[in-house]
Structures are given as structure tokens and as C-alpha cells.
């Protein structure tokens, strides 16, 4: 159940940003103790909100919660708790950034009724997808704050919605940046002129903030995206007062997108991916994306919340009319969007140097609320000679090889994927990174398949007492990443463990820790802000991840103490992949970090090792000046910042 249900709620967990809130709160707490003016920071109230959010997230990990094996009304209660936690964590993030980003801390003034910032997305109820707010522009610059939750310096593509296409974006250094303007669509073919999506590449410090400025100008240098819409009854030119939109008939010709790393071919009939050419070696790789349905058996025992009992192999997803296909060509990204009856499928290619240009962003908005005993899967077929072997991650930490066995029934060959799954042969590895946990299989050589949603009408006699009919419209987000392998040997294929490449780890980190955009709540009269806030002296090593920096509760009451838990994880990675020209803005240091060089604005007063759960300190625990960790280890330290 965990891997196939409640995808909407799992998507919400990603949006919870509980780690970002914990880290920002810990830094804001230290900042607030530095002067009298900043002591009005609502540290106790926010600590209570953090604690409650932590408990709600923990509750949702219950074996009948995240698995979807609860009655409908119980699921609504879980969803409502998550929804409240998201609201509360947003408040903690906003309050914490307020105190950290002010240039003159003496001007700090906390007013509970008017927040200093607002997030760029709103969610109307616990069972709906969030949507972006529209930022109103004037000739006066409007601050756009971008928070980078990863511990490495980052170049990331950021999109926000604004109310005017005459836009200029200034970087934290005050220089104009290249902007792409894309249409915001109502449905498949109608352009909304109430909002415009602007996209640019942001450069952000590790765990830090960059303050960009948006303003309306008479003549904008932003580049408009062009659109081709493939549909049955097409008129040649579709008049629009801003965008160039061509309407075409669905055709047997391919749709082509490319950037400096790869070239992609899509079918002109279905809009689905067919082939990738990697420019590094000039090779073509067949890469067919398709959808498929699973039914359930005609026996007495049928699929339900616990059981997957398919009626044989999946049937291809057949559409009588070709879908509407909308192709966007832009300076920063191009994309192909296919509108099928049950799924809106988007493949986006970023035309940027570095990490984001090297993988394909795939998103599916799935709606099977009108179906009867059916399950929808996305399948990727390649010519990789995977020999029935594929790899999935356990809890985002280790990767485990899986073997598809023909002697087992189909359902026994489906495995959980928490953050990634891959197949490989001597020359290449194809990784599917995921932002939500799902079930994955590799039923044929060179194939990966992900089950996206299930709708089952009957109970399967395991104690739930109902079917699975509370489906929601769900967003699934993936990254598809093809890499070359060097110097592999045959014995390695039989090893019991495998590791992602460094680039793969970073791609997964970008996907699971997206940049958080915010704007100032007031249009004018905003006090002066720092142009950037960088709490770390430099990027952490590429293989080091700050799992959390969490303020420890005081022993007396539900209020914060002056200590925090710094939890670090050193990732294991496979060296048989090139790291040259990958756009990684960090290095590796064999797991060593100098403590006094860690933080920039704050001084480390003490750092002592503790057990993972902070319950125990070793008897010889003393103040460390250097952190030294082996690969694949997680360590917890008690840290005091000043």
C-alpha cells in the first residue's frame, strides 16, 4: 500500500518543508539572542508549531496511514493534520527568514497579524493540489526571496507567476538576468492573460537565501516561449496578443527538443518520448514512454487495498483520438505536454548548463476517479541489456539489486521505490528519480515501470472493510537520467550492493528539496534586506548531507534550549561515472569537515558527538574541532551556536 496509495498526501509531505523550517528556525533562534530588539522573535510559539508538525508527520508514517489502509474518514483526518502542519511550517519559515534577512536588525519588529513574507503557492483544502499565486508588479522593485534547502551552492531554474509580461528580474547583485516568459493555460489550448509564468536561473548560496527583485518596465528584454499545438481540427495560426501559437494536425513526423547535452524525439501522434541522443558520445538510445492498465482477476479474491491480483499482463493504454499535444520552445526550457483522458503527461528539458540540463523532468497529473477496478502504470522501454536485474533504493539510503523472476507471479516482481530506481548494462545506466514513493518493476529486459494510481471497488478481506475509491487528482514528479558508465567489470553486476553516481545523488537532492520562493507581503515600505544570506562558509562536500539542524527542547517546558542537533549523512557513491563538466559546485574531502570553518555568520561554541537519537552521549564525549565520517554513515552531534 505504501508505494501505491495516497500519492497526493505523499506529495504534500514533500511540500511540508519540515527540514527547511527546522534549520531556519535554529539559525533564527541564535540570531534572536544577539540583541534586545530581536528578542521579540516568537521562539516559544514557533517551537510549539514545529513540535506539532513533527508529530503530525510522524503520525502519518503509521502503518495504516501512509499505506492508505485506513477508512476514508480516517484518511481525511490524517490529511487535515498534514494540511495544518504545512500552514504552520510556512509560518515558521516566514518568521525565521524575517529576522535573518533584515539588513538592520534594529529595525526588526514582529507583528503576528501581518506576516513579513508570503509563499508563492496556496492550497485551498487538504485534498487539493497547491497552485501558484500571482505576484503583482509595479515600477517599484518587488522583492522575491529564494531559499535553497540544500547544503551545496546551487544554480536552479525557478518559475513564478506574475501579472504582467513587461517584466525585468534583477539578481542579488543588481544585474538583470535572462528571463523566459511562458503562457499560463486554462485547459489545453486557451491562454489566460491574467497571469504569465516567468522562468530564470537563480544562483543561491548553500542553505541560504538570494534576494531577487521583480519590476515592471516599458520594454522588457524577456524572451517569449513559442507554442505548437497538435490537434485534430486545427486552424493554422491561433491569434494571440502576445505569444506565437501555431496549430498543427497530429502527424507521423517527430517532435524534436534539444539542449547541449541531449536531443529528444517524440511521437507526433501521441506526444510520448521515443528516442534520446546523448551528445557526449553521439549515441542514439531508444527510450519509449507509454502508459498501461492493470485490471483485476475474475476469481473470488480480487485486488484491494492490501492485495495486487492483476488479470495478467498490463494492457496498453489505448486512445481512440490522438491527444492534444502542446509543445513549448523557450530559451530556458522546452516541453511537450500530452493531454490524455486520465493523465496529463509533461516532459520538460532545461536548456541550462550544469545539473538541471542533464536530466529530463517528467510529471504526470493522474485522474482515474471514473474507473472501475483499474490501475495505471507508466512504462519506459529501452535497449539497455539489464538481464532481468534492476535496482531500487531502501529509504533513500542504500540501493538494493532486485531480480525479476519468471517463475514468480507478476505481483511478486513489484518492489518499492522511495527516491530512485535504475537499470544498467556495461555501457549505460538509466535512473528514474522520484519525488514520491511508488511501486516499481522491470518485467522485461531494458524496461522500468511505475504504478501511479489504483482504484479498486471491493474489500480484499484483510481487515479494512472497504475498497479504494477515495482517489484524488494527483501529481507525480520524476527525473529521467541517462549516464555513461566507465570501466565496469562483470563481477560487479553480481554484487549485493550498488551506489548512485555523485550526479545522481545531487539530482535526487534537487528533486526532493526544491527551492522555496517567497515575496514580501507588503508592496511598499519594506525595510532594507540583505542581498544574500549565507549561513555556511562554503558548500558542504558533495557527499555530505545535513539531514537536519534541529533545536533541542529544554528540559523544563515545551520551549527551545540553547542546543541543537546537527545530523549528518555521508553518502556512498559509485566512482565509475564521470564528474567532469557536470556543473557540480562542490568537492569531496574524504568525509572531513573543520568545525570552525562550517558556519559563516555564527560561531560554533561547542560540538559534541551523541547517539543518533540524542538519548546518550559517549562517556569520553568532548568538544570536536573536526568531523570525520566514513561513507554511508549517519552521525548526530549536539551543537551550540553563538
Regions of interest found by a model, annotated:
Residues 15, 94-642:
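C-terminal (or distal) subdomains of carbohydrate-active enzymes
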Amino acid at each position: 500500500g505504501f508505494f501505491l496509495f495516497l500519492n497526493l498526501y505523499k506529495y504534500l509531505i514533500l511540500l511540508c518543508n519540515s527540514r527547511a523550517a527546522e534549520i531556519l528556525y535554529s539559525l533564527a533562534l541564535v540570531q534572536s539572542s544577539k540583541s534586545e530588539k530581536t528578542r521579540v522573535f516568537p521562539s516559544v510559539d514557533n517551537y510549539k508549531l514545529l513540535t506539532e508538525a513533527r508529530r503530525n508527520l510522524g503520525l502519518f508514517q503509521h502503518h495504516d496511514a501512509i499505506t492508505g489502509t485506513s477508512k476514508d474518514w480516517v484518511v481525511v483526518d490524517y490529511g487535515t493534520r498534514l494540511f495544518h502542519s504545512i500552514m504552520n511550517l510556512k509560518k515558521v519559515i516566514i518568521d525565521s527568514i524575517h529576522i535573518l534577512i533584515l539588513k538592520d536588525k534594529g529595525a526588526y519588529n514582529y507583528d503576528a497579524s501581518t506576516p513579513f513574507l508570503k509563499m508563492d503557492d496556496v492550497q485551498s483544502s487538504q485534498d487539493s493540489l497547491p497552485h501558484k499565486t500571482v505576484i503583482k508588479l509595479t515600477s517599484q522593485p518587488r522583492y522575491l526571496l529564494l531559499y535553497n534547502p540544500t547544503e551545496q551552492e546551487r544554480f536552479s531554474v525557478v518559475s513564478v507567476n506574475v501579472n504582467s509580461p513587461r517584466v525585468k528580474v534583477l539578481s542579488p547583485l543588481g544585474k538583470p538576468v535572462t528571463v523566459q516568459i511562458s503562457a499560463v493555460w486554462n485547459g489545453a489550448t486557451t491562454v489566460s492573460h491574467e497571469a504569465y509564468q516567468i522562468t530564470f536561473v537563480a544562483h543561491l548560496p548553500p542553505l541560504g537565501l538570494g534576494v531577487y527583485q521583480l519590476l515592471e518596465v516599458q520594454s522588457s528584454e524577456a524572451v517569449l516561449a513559442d507554442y505548437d499545438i497538435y490537434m485534430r481540427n486545427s486552424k493554422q495560426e491561433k491569434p494571440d496578443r502576445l505569444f506565437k501559437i501555431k496549430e498543427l494536425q497530429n502527424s507521423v513526423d517527430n517532435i524534436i527538443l534539444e539542449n547541449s547535452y541531449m536531443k529528444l524525439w517524440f511521437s507526433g501522434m501521441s506526444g510520448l518520448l521515443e528516442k534520446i541522443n546523448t551528445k557526449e558520445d553521439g549515441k542514439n538510445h531508444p527510450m519509449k514512454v507509454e502508459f498501461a492498465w492493470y485490471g483485476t482477476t475474475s476469481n473470488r479474491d480480487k485486488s484491494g487495498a492490501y492485495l495486487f491480483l492483476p488479470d495478467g499482463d498490463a494492457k496498453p493504454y489505448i486512445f481512440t483520438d490522438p491527444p492534444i499535444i502542446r509543445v513549448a520552445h523557450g530559451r530556458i526550457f522546452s516541453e511537450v505536454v500530452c493531454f490524455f483522458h486520465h493523465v496529463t503527461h509533461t516532459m520538460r528539458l532545461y536548456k541550462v548548463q550544469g545539473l538541471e540540463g542533464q536530466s529530463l523532468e517528467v510529471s504526470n497529473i493522474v485522474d482515474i476517479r471514473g474507473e472501475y477496478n483499474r490501475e495505471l502504470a507508466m512504462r519506459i522501454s529501452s535497449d539497455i541489456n539489464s538481464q532481468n536485474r534492476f535496482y531500487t533504493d531502501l529509504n533513500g539510503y542504500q540501493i538494493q539489486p532486485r531480480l525479476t523472476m519468471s517463475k514468480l507471479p507478476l505481483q511478486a516482481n513489484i518492489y518499492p521505490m522511495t527516491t530512485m530506481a535504475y537499470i544498467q548494462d556495461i555501457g549505460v545506466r538509466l535512473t528514474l528519480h522520484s519525488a514520491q514513493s511508488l511501486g516499481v518493476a522491470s518485467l522485461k529486459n531494458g524496461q522500468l515501470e511505475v504504478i501511479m494510481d489504483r482504484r479498486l471497488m471491493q474489500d480484499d478481506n484483510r481487515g479494512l472493510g472497504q475498497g479504494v475509491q477515495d482517489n484524488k487528482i494527483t501529481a507525480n514528479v520524476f527525473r529521467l537520467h541517462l549516464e555513461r558508465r566507465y570501466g565496469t567489470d562483470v563481477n560487479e553486476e553480481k554484487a549485493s550492493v550498488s551506489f548512485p553516481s555523485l550526479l545522481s545523488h545531487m539530482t535526487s537532492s534537487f528533486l526532493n528539496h526544491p527551492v522555496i520562493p517567497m515575496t514580501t507581503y507588503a508592496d511598499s515600505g519594506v525595510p532594507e534586506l540583505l542581498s544574500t544570506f549565507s549561513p555556511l562558509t562554503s558548500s558542504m562536500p558533495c557527499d555530505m548531507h545535513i539531514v537536519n539542524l534541529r533545536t533541542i527542547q529544554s528540559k523544563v517546558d515545551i520551549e527551545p534550549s540553547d542546543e541543537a542537533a546537527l545530523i549528518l549523512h555521508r553518502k556512498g557513491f559509485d566512482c565509475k561515472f564521470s564528474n567532469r563538466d557536470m556543473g557540480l559546485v562542490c568537492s569531496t574531502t574524504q568525509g572531513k569537515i573543520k568545525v570552525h570553518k562550517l558556519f559563516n555568520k555564527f560561531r560554533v561554541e561547542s560540538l559534541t558527538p551523541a547517539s543518533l537519537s540524542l538519548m546518550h552521549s559517549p562517556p569520553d564525549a568532548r568538544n570536536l574541532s573536526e568531523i570525520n565520517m566514513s561513507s554511508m554513515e549517519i552521525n548526530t552531534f549536539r551543537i551550540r551556536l553563538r
